[in-house]
Amino acid sequence: LTCVKSDSIWFPTSEDCPDGQNLCFKKWQYISPRMYDFTR
């Protein structure tokens, strides 16, 4: 899984996380980063 580390709209950063630890979706990073901020 890929987790969003920064909620920046223009320059979101991500990192790989163990499955089940953090449920973030890379495809949503540039659309609504804050939407998945609560999953971290």
Swiss-Prot record:
Expressed by the venom gland. GO terms for cellular component: extracellular region. InterPro entries: Snake_3FTx (IPR003571), Snake_toxin-like_sf (IPR045860), Toxin_cobra-type (IPR054131). SUPFAM superfamilies: Snake toxin-like. The keyword Disulfide bond applies. It is found in: Secreted. Keywords: Disulfide bond, G-protein coupled acetylcholine receptor impairing toxin, G-protein coupled receptor impairing toxin, Neurotoxin, Postsynaptic neurotoxin, Secreted, Toxin. Disulfide bonds join 3-24. GO terms for molecular function: toxin activity. Contains 4 disulfide bonds. Binds irreversibly and specifically to M1 (CHRM1) muscarinic acetylcholine receptors, blocking further binding of antagonists and preventing the action of agonists. Belongs to the three-finger toxin family. Short-chain subfamily. Aminergic toxin sub-subfamily. Monomer. This is Muscarinic m1-toxin3.
